[in-house]
Curated annotation (Swiss-Prot):
Encoding gene per record: MIC27
Entry keyword set: Membrane, Mitochondrion, Mitochondrion inner membrane, Transmembrane, Transmembrane helix
Protein name: MICOS complex subunit MIC27
Family statement: Belongs to the apolipoprotein O/MICOS complex subunit Mic27 family.
Gene Ontology cellular component annotations, sorted alphabetically: mitochondrial inner membrane
Organism: Lachancea thermotolerans (strain ATCC 56472 / CBS 6340 / NRRL Y-8284) (Yeast)
Purpose of the protein: Component of the MICOS complex, a large protein complex of the mitochondrial inner membrane that plays crucial roles in the maintenance of crista junctions, inner membrane architecture, and formation of contact sites to the outer membrane.
């Protein structure tokens, strides 16, 4: 026969008055809230205050960084707008070049830049060739004088940019001149620009152009002298 627990005389029923709180809790630090269902929620005031402080701190920092980010984004947008306005007013002043020549000339300038990189690459002139050794015998491949000039450090630095500038100056001369003028006036220091023009005048105006003019005068004088001698010779021979 099964046992009937309700018939036990020694059964003990504990008290159910009020909530059972551990002795470790201090009731003055715990707030109680009763739900409509009759359940009670216990909340530690210390933990609630601590989490509230953390939440306020994180929220405060978030708004600070968000405001700073929005400010930087606005400043960057204003700077970009200023650059666009400056370029439109001082560089891209020729409508025909801007609408018809800017894109193709930029593509050709990019090709000129990489052409300069190829021409100044040591590998393309045999410096790294396996035949560039004395063991190759009659097959020894030595770089030419032109290759040594084009692969020098100044050429490797300047040649790509010189070719790029040459293409742009020939295809879009107005835009190129405006770019150089804007660079000299608003970007580079005035002392550097003055020194650059001085060196340019010494090398080009006082050097190359004067030498070219002198050679032209000498050649012209020689031609005129030669033509005069031929005329005198013909007059003498023909008894004119």
């Amino acid at each position: 026969m099964s046992r009937n627990f309700y018939a036990d005389e020694g059964a003990f029923v504990g008290s159910s008055k009020g909530p059972l709180l551990p002795d470790i809790l201090h009731t003055e630090d715990v707030s109680t809230k009763t739900l409509p269902t009759g359940n009670q929620i216990y909340d530690s005031k210390a933990l609630d205050s601590w989490f509230s402080g953390i939440r306020k701190y994180v929220t405060h920092k978030y708004y600070i960084y968000k405001t700073e980010l929005d400010t930087q984004k606005s400043a960057a947008a204003n700077e970009w707008k200023s650059v666009q306005d400056y370029v439109s007013q001082h560089v891209l002043t020729d409508d025909y070049e801007k609408q018809e020549l800017l894109v193709p000339s930029s593509a050709l300038a990019l090709g000129a830049f990489f052409t300069g990189r190829v021409l100044s690459n040591r590998r393309n002139w045999g410096f790294d060739s396996p035949l560039n050794t004395t063991k190759a015998g009659i097959l020894t491949r030595n770089p030419s004088a032109l290759g040594r000039v084009l692969t020098s450090i100044p050429s490797r630095v300047l040649l790509p940019w010189v070719l790029t500038g040459t293409v742009l100056s020939q295809l879009t001369p107005v835009t190129w001149n405006n770019s150089v003028k804007a660079l000299e006036q608003d970007v580079l220091p005035a002392d550097l620009v003055a020194r650059y023009h001085e060196i340019w005048n010494q090398l080009l105006v006082d050097g190359v152009q004067k030498t070219s003019a002198s050679v032209h005068r000498n050649v012209d004088a020689s031609l005129q002298q030669g033509i005069g001698e031929v005329r005198r010779y013909l007059v003498k021979k023909l008894d004119l």
